[in-house]
Amino acid sequence: MAVFVGFAVAYALLIPLGNSPDELSHLNYVRLIAHHAAFPPAGVREHQQPPLVYLLGAALLRAGAPERSLRLISAAAGAAGVIAGALIARNVAPRRPVLAVGAAGFLALLPGSQFVAGSISDDSLAIAVGAWVLLVCVLVVKAPAPSGRLLAAAGVVTGAALITKQTDWAPLAALLVAIVWHWRTKLRWRHAVPLAGLPLLIAGWWYARNLVTFHSVLPPLVHGDKLQLNQARGFVSQTARSWFRPERFQGGLITLPRAGVVVEEVLIATLFAVMLYAAYRAVRAWPALQTWQRSAVVALCAAAVLAVASSFVNSATVIIQPQGRYLLTAAAAPALAAGAVLASGVVRRPRLTLTLAGLCAAAAMALSAIGLHTSLVAYG
């Protein structure tokens, strides 16, 4: 956690404002609310984004905080997302605390996530909200019957997801399916009060505003170049690399020195190998898992698959955006997989496992330092 917060705060304090993707557009959204009590109309960049993070930022500006402090909202949200990831792993495997440590480490050491958490954007809050949605999803499949507190939690995170960003819809879909399926024989009409009433209270006004302003539940989307079939390989490559390096404010990834590219490629290959081994271990362990644990794993994986699918569909039908941060809202599944591999290795070959884990962590931190230094040279 200290590494994550340290790099996020370093980006927030050292990189001049406006040098993260669309940062000035996000800042203008906040200024509109803070100084004019208005949301951006159609034609203004980022007008399609739900307003939660911008309302929080406007409150800071109205309180007299400097504009750079808006980046700290992202840093705090990023830390909350890491905590939620650890809690997900802890609840899925309560007797294996190493698994939670591995999941948190996976989320905290992603250089691209640290960069996002140091910029003015709605993505860091969306990542955090997505993680908390999936935590509630795990708690739902773990609970034999609905309780007042759990129903309220589900309603609150649903409302938060609906007013944060559309990238939260993938984990939200997993939560809603889990509620309906797992509690299908125990849901009563009275349960609709927290499950539907709280989201309406939290986010309903935003969608009503859209109907009045745009005559549509959602604001008009911004269209651009679409993903073509012959671009698929490059799209996947750039999406994967964006988990491991900063982005330019003009769009696209920042150019790393050769040493950084080598470290990045090693980490991507390692991540791929870890995911494959985690899948193998999951198949082997599946019969021994409790029913609710299987449901939790399926829900987390389904959210990840939906996030990937929605990224492809959006890029093919609206505008091409090979940005891995959009997938981090449902990153609990790969985080859990990484934690499971670590926990399994600690039992089987502790010395080798801890050595390899330490090397991976050191490589990730080195890549974070290279990315930060490269950004400082370019924009500092």
What function would you assign to each model-found segment?
Residues 1-23, 40, 109, 197-212, ...:
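Transmembrane signal-anchor helices characteristic of membrane glycosylation enzymes that use polyprenol
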Residues 68-94:
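Transmembrane-helix motifs of polytopic, lipid-linked glycan transferases
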Residues 142, 171-200:
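Perimembrane helix-loop-helix junctions
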Residues 7-10, 24-55, 60-62:
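Extracytosolic helix-loop segments that constitute the early lumenal/periplasmic catalytic or substrate-binding loops
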Residues 84, 125-143, 157-158, 333-337:
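Specific aromatic-rich, kink-prone transmembrane helix
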Residues 150-166, 171-177:
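Membrane-interface alpha helices of multi-pass inner-membrane proteins
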Residues 112-126:
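Short acidic/glycine- and proline-prone juxtamembrane loop motifs at membrane-interface regions
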Residues 211-282:
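Membrane-lumen/periplasm interface segments of multi-pass, membrane-embedded glycan/lipid transferases
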